[in-house]
Amino acid sequence: MWFEILPGLSVMGVCLLIPGLATAYIHRFTNGGKEKRVAHFGYHWSLMERDRRISGVDRYYVSKGLENID
């Protein structure tokens, strides 16, 4: 019957899901708990560079917050 394909389909779905989740967790671990940002456009790149300059430690993912910016 049609339901005999469900176990194989679920195994295939899990195998396709694992690399995406693993990549997200590896990036989060290596970047100190922050998500990895990707600059697809020049404007996004300039925002990342601004965040890097503002952070004071030369890393775009370390935020100071608006109240701490001089």
UniProtKB/Swiss-Prot annotation:
Tissues showing expression: Primarily expressed in heart and skeletal muscle.
Chief location category: mitochondrion
UniProt xrefs under InterPro entries: NADH_Ub_cplx-1_asu_su-1
Keywords from the named record: Disease variant, Electron transport, Membrane, Mitochondrion, Mitochondrion inner membrane, Primary mitochondrial disease, Respiratory chain, Transmembrane, Transmembrane helix, Transport
Listed GO CC annotations: mitochondrial inner membrane; mitochondrial membrane; mitochondrion; respiratory chain complex I
Transmembrane segments: 1-21
GO molecular function terms attached to this record: NADH dehydrogenase (ubiquinone) activity
GO BP: aerobic respiration; mitochondrial electron transport, NADH to ubiquinone; proton motive force-driven mitochondrial ATP synthesis
Subcellular location: Mitochondrion inner membrane
Keyword check for Translocase: no
Membrane-topology descriptor: Single-pass membrane protein
Coiled coil region boundaries: none
Disease note: Mitochondrial complex I deficiency, nuclear type 12: A form of mitochondrial complex I deficiency, the most common biochemical signature of mitochondrial disorders, a group of highly heterogeneous conditions characterized by defective oxidative phosphorylation, which collectively affects 1 in 5-10000 live births. Clinical disorders have variable severity, ranging from lethal neonatal disease to adult-onset neurodegenerative disorders.
Protein family: Belongs to the complex I NDUFA1 subunit family.
Reported function: Accessory subunit of the mitochondrial membrane respiratory chain NADH dehydrogenase (Complex I), that is believed not to be involved in catalysis. Complex I functions in the transfer of electrons from NADH to the respiratory chain. The immediate electron acceptor for the enzyme is believed to be ubiquinone.
Subunit details: Complex I is composed of 45 different subunits.
Name this polypeptide is given: NADH dehydrogenase [ubiquinone] 1 alpha subcomplex subunit 1
Species of origin: Homo sapiens (Human)
